[in-house]
Amino acid sequence: FLLKSQLCYCLFGIELIGAGIHALHEDEIFTVDYCGTNCTKQSNGSWTTCPGNCSCYHEDGKTDGFCLSTEYTDFTQFPNLTSEEMDAATPRPE
């Protein structure tokens, strides 16, 4: 139960940070996703690896962390799309 509470608190805090960044710059988004696994500090001081493009994030002095993927998108690098271009890029139901 404690781990789930800590996870919710951590993810909730990250969501607030992401929302705060989003509120500062409307054309930029920073997203954080939990990768479904945790990481652990080993006796030699290294951390267990996380899957895929996920990285281990942990507090100083702790031996457990969360595997998270982060992504930054700057929408100012994309031109203004026309309605036709947006329609063409919209996913269609199967």
From Swiss-Prot:
GO terms for cellular component: extracellular region. It comes from the Eukaryota. GO terms for molecular function: C-X-C chemokine binding. Glycans are attached at residues 38, 44, 53, 80. Keywords: Disulfide bond, Glycoprotein, Secreted. Signal peptide: none annotated. It is found in: Secreted. Disulfide bonds join 35-54, 39-56, 50-67. Salivary chemokine-binding protein which binds to host chemokines CXCL1, CXCL2, CXCL5 and CXCL8. This is Evasin P1172. It comes from Ixodes ricinus.
